[in-house]
UniProtKB/Swiss-Prot annotation:
Identification of the protein by name: Probable metal transport system membrane protein CPn_0346/CP_0414/CPj0346/CpB0353
A GO BP entry: response to zinc ion
Keyword Cell cycle: no
Organism: Chlamydia pneumoniae
One Pfam family matching this protein: ABC-3
Family: Belongs to the ABC-3 integral membrane protein family.
Alphabetic keyword roster: Cell inner membrane, Cell membrane, Membrane, Transmembrane, Transmembrane helix, Transport
Amino acid sequence: MALGPSPYYGVSFFQFFSVFFSRLFSGSLFTGSLYIDDIQIIVFLAISCSGAFAGTFLVLRKMAMYANAVSHTVLFGLVCVCLFTHQLTTLSLGTLTLAAMATAMLTGFLIYFIRNTFKVSEESSTALVFSLLFSLSLVLLVFMTKNAHIGTELVLGNADSLTKEDIFPVTIVILANAVITIFAFRSLVCSSFDSVFASSLGIPIRLVDYLIIFQLSACLVGAFKAVGVLMALAFLIIPSLIAKVIAKSIRSLMAWSLVFSIGTAFLAPASSRAILSAYDLGLSTSGISVVFLTMMYIVVKFISYFRGYFSKNFEKISEKSSQY
């Protein structure tokens, strides 16, 4: 990462894009030094795109609450691996992903076990499991690191601490998710709508479930190492929820998810830098991204509602006029 004066220093919201794209098209991003704003854009783009690939099928399967639970409980698996290996920062991406997958399956088992044993609703058992495992992981993590504030950084992230080394893990994650989505697209779609029919076609349902858990776990691990759990969960669920309002097919659902994710990946760092330049106030970039995604969802929902309202009224007026 570059140590000299940043070209992004003191820029406004629109100047941020001018600086970034001028560096992109001039080749400075590939041949020159990378600044923290460049790294934020690259990492956010990778996380947002990988989240759109996995989130599309999570939303189709109505697994948003499960993804919310796993996004918190996955920390328990990562902490346990660190305890057993006595390593905190040198673990490989593969090891962390396997730990995350194991925790994701443990979370699903505990939710199922509590729901059926104690006869409570699935929402209640989900809340109990992720609250328990997440609190245990924070206690163990504070015990390991002697840092009482590390839980805040894991939830909100710390985009200002990103380095060039954070680019490689999220790049591997997006490539893995893209390959799985492309080659298993038909199986993922079919099993998401009708698992019985998919099984009759010879599609290995259990393997498809494991692939989705792998995608979810890989996204969360990449985000934990970069920007925290809040932004990961936002990019996993909200873009697909927005796209679901306007999409007419699965491919368009995924395409719109990518559009909203990529747009937020650019808007959040630009807004964070603009606020810092104008008011000397440093805000959480991941928090800003969640605000943008929520605003997009509200706007798209309102537009969809009013478009449906006016189209219905227009049809009624047309029917009445045709009668005369």
